[in-house]
Amino acid sequence: MNNFQNIPDNELFDPSENMLAASVDERVYHRVYLSAEYAVNLVENGTPQFLARAEDVVRAVLKCQELDKKNPHYGNFFWEKEEGIVEDLNAVEFVLIRFIPMTLRYSDRISKSLQKKIRSAVRIALDEVARVDVGLIYTNIVAQDIVNSILGGQLLAESSYIKRGFKKLRDWQAFIDRNGIPHEYNSPVYNSVTINALSHLVELTNDNEVRMIAKLIMIRLGISFGLHLHPKTKRLAGPHCRAYYPFLTLQTSPESDVLDDHINHKQLPNWLRKLVLHRPLKMNVRETSDVQKKISIGTYHSQSFSLGVASRELDTQSNRYISNQSNVFSVQYTRGSDLTPGIVYSRYLLNDKWLGDYRTTLSRGDRDIFFEEGSFRGIQDGPRSINIYAPKNLGAWERCFSAKASLIWHSDINEIWINGKDIKELPIEVINTDVIVVGCGDVYVAILPLSLTNLGSEAPIRIVKREQNVVLELYNYQGPTKTFWELARPGAFYQGRTRCGFYAEVAEKSDYSSGADFAAVVTRGLLIENFDDPITYNGENERLWAVEYRRDNETLGIELDMMQFEIKRMWTHDASDMLPMLDSPIATQALDGDVKINDSILKCEGEGTRWLVSLPDEHTWIAAFHGPGPSSFILEIPEGRVEIDKLTRGLITWENGQIQIEATGLEGIPKIVGGLITKIN
């Protein structure tokens, strides 16, 4: 008996169209790329009945390719069959990333006639991929572009596609290596999309250099993934460049399961589990995704919580499908051993909009994206952060009756303290000199509102309940519907962006006797704001706003030019580089020089990114050099030494004295002290 129910998403199969279908607002849509995924799963199963259905599904998907040669997107695909047009330009990548590897792996399971159709479709699709030529900032799509081009070229025996893909791969690696991590930082969804795409290339490419570059990018992404996983919540700590609402509010499977799947499928190495489980109980991680735009992400792990803050939102694409999805501030926390973790996160909202008021298109639900309407600048260090918002599109075009930053507790809270007083009733209004402490799960979250620009007669700060959430609202405006000439850019009245924001600090409940006790500690600190007097913008002048919090011997600060809403500087008491490629107690990365951590050192004389993971308690060290030029390579650890005369790109793993060396351009015999080589290439 052939049980189609064992195939993922089989319950969505519509035999009348041979595609997967979903109902949205009582209208049925047939999903093109998900149907392609369904076909792959059928082919992998391999029984005659499954293969027969797979052929029907593939043919149905191919009918959703744009075949009008006059169309500028000839060769692309519809996102849904019902659209009948190409709008989402990513559709071609999402279909090809399924059909190309499937055909390379399982050509013996696919009829000759269908293979011919697939190859014909792939050829015109790859021409469309080249015309679209996605930019290097779009991480998951550029990864699919590269994989589809190289493997599609192999499938078609067409070197021009391979050459284009290889060039783009090298350009992408160089782009990443100027910063630290890929531009789409720390996404609970698109991390895996990128890893899955690159894993096809690692497995199926005929070129060792291609394989090595793809593997280095994939593993570096895996390191970032692992460093942001919290061992107790089992979730991917913030900040997130893009997080759909079910992922943001922890309604999906834990990301620890996702990492395990990648490891179990041999896409990522097993030692990443050690990186998650065997590390300091309290740990700060900082990475940079864009040095030029000063985008860094900071995450602090404590026993019961993680705090994640981005220096700015992902704002490099003006696209309703992609933009305004960043999760720039969040605290994830445990709520006892058996409960789903809780979360508090932030949004800037206009006209009292909420979840359900925005959808990308009719065929996608209105509960996927909690639309972010603010621009954000922030800095984090340990359990503390300064978080600054400005409305993104408030000006003299659209009318508005409310504009506010909101801190949203998605899970039940236990207690609220204001200036040490336990609050029992909501709503309640506060002022910006109040100290607010919220007890939720196993943590306390303290908030100090910053000074706010009042665009009307009143700009209240209040704590309210909204749809089972508790929300701290920080208003810039509440009043009659109007435009704001003073915010129009360009404009004759513009004097800079509005001020709005908060200082946040998180603590373990077990460290304090009450919320009042924690509030007293936070109050001991000094919150300092300095801002320039109003001045009309002349195209060159600046108007600075600096915010700093000091307590004991610790300092955290950020300064912005409010005319451009750009970061001038960020600082802490002990960090000289606020835009490191990677800085943590167990992993670090640099563009040049020696890399040192935990009594271990990596020395590479050549130019190029190098990184080191050090887990001495697990007798595990991993080091890499990204190239692209040749370099010597010396890894010195407490248990021994690896010395390589020359390599172009390399990954060296030392686990319990067993050494694996994967490299291109390897010259000379590696010299080993204290260990044994078990694998070379």
Write out the residue ranges for each language-model feature:
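Composition- and surface-driven signal marking solvent-exposed, interaction-prone regions
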Residues: 210-216, 311-312, 320-325, 398-406
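Extended repeat-based interaction scaffolds and adjacent low-complexity, acidic/S/T/P-biased segments
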Residues: 356-681
